[in-house]
A protein has these predicted regions:
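Conserved two-metal-ion catalytic palm core of "right-hand" nucleic acid polymerases
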Residues: 1-115, 124, 137, 141, ...
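Generic amphipathic alpha-helical segments used as scaffolds and interaction surfaces in large
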Residues: 35, 39, 43, 68-71, ...
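Right-hand nucleic-acid polymerase module
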Residues: 46, 50, 138, 192, ...
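Short acidic (Asp/Glu) and glycine-rich catalytic loops that position anionic groups and cofactors
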Residues: 29-31, 60-64, 97, 177, ...
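A common structural junction motif
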Residues: 199-208
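Compositionally biased, low-complexity linear motifs
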Residues: 4-6, 117-122, 165, 242-256
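Conserved polymerase palm-domain catalytic core
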Residues: 9, 13-14, 82-178, 182-200, ...
Length: 348
């Protein structure tokens, strides 16, 4: 089979794939035990979704607000942390007050009709639209949390909100981390008016609702006056940044569990190294030295992950080839390129 024929066959397979039957998985997240409904994609669906996102990235990234973070390459929580630290330490006048808010049941509430209408205005390829609509319709309401396409579609859906806040409301410092948002300002009344305008925009333009627990408060200053900002897993003060307590507790519990095992698993190693990435970029070394360092050897964990990763790409390649050939494709004459994309900042 020629390369052109193989590519054509692969495209036909992607365009004509059908959604699998899904059983929702319920997880209870964080110390608040918040219930989340996850739709776990099959290997076939995951492969198709990655192909779609790779093709659609130019559209998703065009016009994206520069301080929109989460689930985007190079835009994890650590990058957002650096930006907020720069704002609060170099421009204290415009960071006197904070408006903190998020969207109620964001993924579960995105209206299909509005999302599809927005896609129709931008995409003129009927096959791509049909494929995207098929994925969106996996759930009757909202978009499926757990699908690779969902994080890109949801970020893209809120682009208009980002530009409304920055350009029409003239927010000096504004950041969005998926559906969590913060706006810094010098005037409390102005932030309250912004909050109302944002709430109206969400309802009228996007069919979404601002959660009722929004806050406007005086940011940390002087000798323990004002409040710290809890955002993206960090707690920001005027002169330091520490980890959110819940994340630090998870890290210490994981370290203690590993210390009681004869041998750490690869999942243990990855999770603990992810926590180390968070600890390294915050002012929490004393807590790390007291509670975590005595329990685990990070050098051993790094070696374990390194050894595993040497064989991981080969296993993924073989699985993709098996899936492709099982669907009627020919593996000979076709080279599958497997590229690992991950951001340590998004591991929590």
């Amino acid at each position: 089979m020629s390369d052109d024929a193989a590519v054509e066959q692969s495209l036909d397979w992607i365009v004509n794939y059908e959604n699998a039957e899904h059983v929702p998985v319920y997880i209870y997240d964080g110390i608040t035990r918040k219930e989340r409904t996850i739709i776990v994609p099959t290997m076939e669906e995951l492969l198709v979704q990655h192909c779609i996102v790779n093709a659609m990235k130019p559209m998703f990234c065009k016009g994206m607000y520069e301080h929109s973070y989460a689930s985007l390459p190079g835009r994890g929580a650590h990058k957002g942390k650096q930006v907020i630290e720069k704002w609060i330490r170099t421009d204290p006048k415009n960071c006197k007050y904070v408006l903190k808010m998020d969207i109620r049941h964001f993924f579960d509430s995105i209206p299909h009709d509005r999302l599809k209408a927005k896609l129709k205005k931008t995409i003129h390829d009927e096959k791509m639209l049909e494929l995207l609509f098929r994925i969106i319709d996996v759930t009757e309401v909202g978009i499926p949390l757990g699908f690779y396409t969902s994080q890109w579609l949801s970020n893209w859906y809120l682009q208009g909100l980002d530009h409304f806040i920055k350009e029409q409301l003239c927010a000096v410092h504004y950041m969005r981390y998926m559906d969590d948002m913060v706006v810094f300002g010098s005037n409390k009344r102005v932030l309250h008016r912004m909050r109302q305008a944002i709430s109206d925009y969400l309802e009228i333009e996007l069919g979404l609702e601002l959660k009722a627990n929004w806050q406007v408060f005086r940011f940390s200053y002087g000798n323990n006056q004002g409040r710290d900002l809890d955002f993206m897993g960090f707690r920001f003060y005027r002169n330091r940044t520490i980890l959110r307590k819940s994340i630090m507790h998870k890290a210490t519990r994981k370290a203690r569990k590993i210390s009681k095992k004869e041998k750490a698993t690869i999942l243990d190693a990855r999770q603990m190294l992810s926590y180390l990435g968070w600890i390294d970029c915050t002012d929490t070394y004393l807590m790390y030295r007291k509670w975590i360092k005595p329990c685990v050897s990070f050098q051993q964990l790094k070696r374990k992950v390194s050894r595993y990763d040497k064989h991981d790409e080969k296993r993924v390649y073989q699985k993709l080839v098996s899936l492709y050939t099982a669907k009627g494709g020919k593996s000979h004459g076709v080279e599958l390129q497997v590229r690992r994309e991950h951001s340590p900042a998004d591991c929590i």
